[in-house]
């Protein structure tokens, strides 16, 4: 099955638990359609470069999936219809890199720098 990476931004007024439950919800949509979530990361509440739907911040989430194209299309369709999801981006990749994503690596590096001071 093809490999995909998805990033979506949800509204800023959601709690962290609600934003993380969206990841689980869309993972179950994939599972119902014959796919699976290989890895998921919640990147947290981040400030955006510009407003989207009158929101200056958003909860970012990242999914690595292994799913057939119809399952991904159904998940994207439901994401775009969901009121809490503001933006969705999906890319097809040849392979999933091992370890955490670049965003999570940056956070770990920042924590290491603070410890050295």
Curated annotation (Swiss-Prot):
Pfam families: Ribosomal_S6. Keywords: Ribonucleoprotein, Ribosomal protein, RNA-binding, rRNA-binding. HAMAP family: Ribosomal_bS6. The gene is rpsF. The keyword Ribosomal protein applies. Belongs to the bacterial ribosomal protein bS6 family. Binds together with bS18 to 16S ribosomal RNA. Residues 105-117 have a biased composition (Basic and acidic residues). Residues 92-117 are annotated as: Disordered. This is Small ribosomal subunit protein bS6. It comes from Dinoroseobacter shibae (strain DSM 16493 / NCIMB 14021 / DFL 12). GO terms for molecular function: small ribosomal subunit rRNA binding; structural constituent of ribosome. One of its GO terms (cellular component) is cytosolic small ribosomal subunit. SUPFAM superfamilies: Ribosomal protein S6. GO terms for biological process: translation. PANTHER family: MITOCHONDRIAL 28S RIBOSOMAL PROTEIN S6 (PTHR21011), SMALL RIBOSOMAL SUBUNIT PROTEIN BS6M (PTHR21011:SF1).
